[in-house]
Amino acid sequence: NEWAAVAAARAAVVGGFKGTANLLAAQMYGLNAIGTAAHCFTLVHDDERSAFESQIAALGKNTTLLVDTYNIEEAVKTAVEVAGPELGGVRIDSGDLASLAQRVRNQLDALGATNTKITVTNDLDEYALASLQTAPVDSYGVGTMLVTGSGAPTCAMVYKLTERENSAG
């Protein structure tokens, strides 16, 4: 049913979630719209730096930048260069989340962004959340497994097809 995600978003907030990344549910039910940019947002820019600059120009330095589209270490460096040490947060959406969160935390601290938050996403279920308890993670983006339920089949993949004309025409 095409309305299942909207209903699930409302139910999650009723159940204690801070908000939803489902913009239709947020609009329909007056919920707090939260979330970060998608990989396609980064891909439609000439490079990661210009994507980060665009997001910060629109949402301010307190936004959360997605840092795993290309190279996480380079993205974190670029994010702090663009936003400064007051960058609100970074999001990791793939790979070994616990290990990457630790590496990113160390890098952020070394760059002076000691208050920058780390959010992890990627088909998180109760087992993944339990495995992340000792990782330096500030928040979790839970969606797929919340809506479908643990044990139900899902398609854990991202297809990043993007076409655009570059700035040179």
Residue ranges of predicted features:
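Buried, small/hydrophobic-residue-enriched core segments of structured protein domains
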Residues: N1-T114, L124-S131, A135-P136, T148, ...
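Short hydrophobic alpha-helical runs that function as membrane-insertion/retention elements
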Residues: G35, T119, S139-V142
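Generic secondary-structure boundary/loop-capping signal
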Residues: A38, S94, G143, V158-Y159
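Active-site lining segments that contact anionic ligands and/or coordinate catalytic metals
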Residues: N115, V137, A156-V158
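Glycine-rich phosphate-binding active-site loops on the catalytic face of alpha/beta enzymes
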Residues: D138-C155
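C-terminal structural cap/anchor segments
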Residues: S150-G169
